[in-house]
Every structure is written in C-alpha cells, then in structure tokens.
Amino acid sequence: MAHKKGVGSSKNGRESESKRLGVKIFGGQAAIAGNIIVRQRGSKHNPGENVYMGKDHTLHARVAGLVKFQKKGENKSYVSVVAFEA
C-alpha cells in the first residue's frame, strides 16, 4: 500500500459550478415587480426606466410591465420595463 496519494489525484477536481448568468426575461415578455430580468457580472446591461440594479449587478423590475431592451450609442445596452396601463 502506498503511503502517499497518487500524483495526479490531488491535481483534479477544480471545475467550478456554473453561475446561471444571463437574460431571464426577454424583450416583449411580461415581468412583475421584483422579477430578475438579467443576472450578470459587471454592468453589461444597464438599468433603464422602471429597472434597478442590485449589488451583484442583477437587474430587477421595479413595476409590472413588458420588458424592453435597447441599445444607445456604440455598445451601451439598456433594459427598461414599460408599465401596464392601470
């Protein structure tokens, strides 16, 4: 019996768990207040009207409505929620 581990065994097993990032509610779909619209690292998408950004850069709907994505300028993407009529 070996008194030390095999050489390769301790060098394996570092695969990290996926973080499930990305768009959760797409443009034209309905969101209710508090729904997660985009989970991201950094501000790839910026908050527009009726959207706020959490401390981990996640975008949430502030009100119920339809999600709208739009580009402004070269590479600025904004996500907004168009509120439903009352």
Curated annotation (Swiss-Prot):
A Pfam family per the record: Ribosomal_L27
GO molecular function: structural constituent of ribosome
Domain of life assignment: Bacteria
Keyword list, A-Z: Ribonucleoprotein, Ribosomal protein
InterPro entries: Ribosomal_bL27, Ribosomal_bL27_CS
GO terms, biological process: translation
A cellular-component GO term for this protein: cytosolic large ribosomal subunit
PANTHER family assigned: LARGE RIBOSOMAL SUBUNIT PROTEIN BL27M, RIBOSOMAL PROTEIN L27
HAMAP family: Ribosomal_bL27
Family in the record: Belongs to the bacterial ribosomal protein bL27 family.
The name this protein goes by in its record: Large ribosomal subunit protein bL27
